[in-house]
Amino acid sequence: MLSHKKSLDILKKTNALLEGHFVLSSGLHSSKYIQCAKLLSYPVLAEKICKSLANKIKKKYKKIDLILAPAMGGVIIGYEIGKLLKKETIFCERVNGKFTLRRGFNINKGSKIIIIEDVITTGKSSIECSKLVTDNGAEIIGYACIIDRTNGKSNIKQKIVSQIELYIPTFEENKLPKSLSLIHI
């Protein structure tokens, strides 16, 4: 398995770790942003990270029926993990603000499912995907991602399996530190 340091070096090498002023999908502000699409543009390096994450998932979960990834960020990572674990992989996408299964995908009742994302910050997308799983009578056995930046403060109750844990402070718009407020978005 790749070490945290080697994984972080790959993020830096692929210019996936950006610095500046960013508004995250959660609406929170941050001085750093992880653009996993940059990592994924280097398939050999992305495969190394995904292989290491897949090994962690395999160690923790013995019975996986299906991998579910939220579009857009989780699709390629979900596919790569599914390939490595030899598991069916599907994705859900937002329609009118709600995650939905389309394109003929379905979730079988009783299936044991792992939700895989690129980056988890607040856990909002994962929790929304969870509802889709439980509404279909399936069971979420775990969550996994390339980068966990929750610092243990997400709405996800289970331990997240990740390749990289990064604590990057986030701020509400009305509580920005001066140094961040001076950087234009």
PLM regions: where:
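Adenylate-forming
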Residues: 67, 184-185
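Active-site-facing substrate-recognition patch
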Residues: 1-60
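Short, well-ordered alpha-helices that flank and scaffold nucleotide-derived cofactor binding pockets
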Residues: 55, 59, 79, 83, ...
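A contiguous pocket-lining binding segment that forms or flanks enzyme active sites
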Residues: 106-139, 144-145
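PRPP-dependent phosphoribosyltransferase catalytic core
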Residues: 4-10, 130-183
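Short, glycine/charge-rich flexible loops or terminal/linker lids adjacent to PRPP-binding catalytic cores
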Residues: 72, 77-114, 122-124
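Short glycine-rich phosphate-binding loop at a beta-alpha junction
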Residues: 62-71
